[in-house]
Amino acid sequence: MKGIFLTALALTAACQADKSPSALLPVGTVLAGATTTNPTERVAELYVSTEVVGFIEPCGCTSKPLGGVQRLATVLKRGRPAHALLDAGNLLFPAEPLTDTTREQHVLKARILARVYRQLGAVAINLGPSDLTLGAAFLKELQREGAVPWVSSNIRPLGEDGPAIAQSFLRDVGGIHVGVLGVATPESFAGVKGVAAIEYATAVRAEQALLRRRGAEIVVVLARVGEKGADDLARDVPEIDVIVRAPGTPIGTPPAPPKKVGSVIVLEAGSQGQHTGRLTLRFGAQVTRPIALDDAGADQAARRALADRKIRAFRTELDAWQADPTKADAVAKKRAQIAELEKQLAAPAPAPGPQPLGSVRVELVPLTEDVPPDPIVADVLAAYYAELKNLNLSKGDVRLCAKTAAAPTYVGTEACKSCHPQAYALWKTTKHGKAWATLESQNKHFD
């Protein structure tokens, strides 16, 4: 079965290798990327992920699961021919320590993520602390299996046993020279062996200057420094253009809309690979700074969502106040506030206009069930689950699960049916009634 798994990975490589206009090359090399036919207009897309932490697809615990590398592959293939993929750090492993029970499973997933990201056109993967969960030697092994473009300007390898970690990359994406560098907080690498960490703002300032001298027209920083750290970095080093900050907003809360901090665009893409950020670069023959942010209506949507939350909160207050005659004036004012907010929401939200020349449009793309899985990457995941089944079966003696006369037995739902026929009939109509069959049909009952 391991052969099937490796064959599936090889198939992905054979079908997708070298199709990206941003294939991996040594530091200092600028690619001849796909260019537009109009020399006065250059358009390219950058896709970004933040805090994937080893998730190759959603766990399936929610009614509308988000995420999955097979969906990410589809989104990228539907995008512009000139595109590249970036990650802001902590791609491979969870932030919490691995257990002996799940270690091998996480290693399998890390190998999938490294290979799939590479074949989807990843041109820079910022080094996060959890990426070094198995040590620097493991990352070097991944690079031997297939080039993995690690980047960090302030986390540097020690000795020769670790992976190659570039301080920055210069890429040609759709005729646009994109400089990419990565940083992380030194304290997040405290106790991590094989690397040395230095202060990141100084490293960014020096590296962006080098990228400019080499011809970078736009400089993107993959910064695993938190929200405040990203805002401070934008103020401290205004010479950069874009910060992709991590960690992203935890799942269950919508990712923050993009914003401008001074002249710098700051954005994130959530967590666990549930979304991808899409940056559409649209420039003329020259790039004029500061680069404008086109948020594709995200700020307007956030304002409308805030207004809706306020209405619900105000109505809750009204319910508590209306029985109190001493609060009549407050009730009237609150009703007026609700009416004004409802008036704002009644007006249709303006549709985003054409993207202006000289701007970066930032959109958050949710990887929903509506996005069909890419068949090649789906085959890789199917091989992974088959390998995982064999792996977990090999860990124990299945004979210990055999029935014995003295041991309690599992009777199943049929034993409930005779006493509770109506409840049983209702249960059979729910998703709970076919939960195990669902797991089996997707080969996930050993996950």
Residue ranges, per PLM feature:
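Secreted/extracellular small peptides and ectodomain modules produced from precursors
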Residues: 13, 57-59, 399, 414
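Bacterial N-terminal signal peptides
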Residues: 2-13
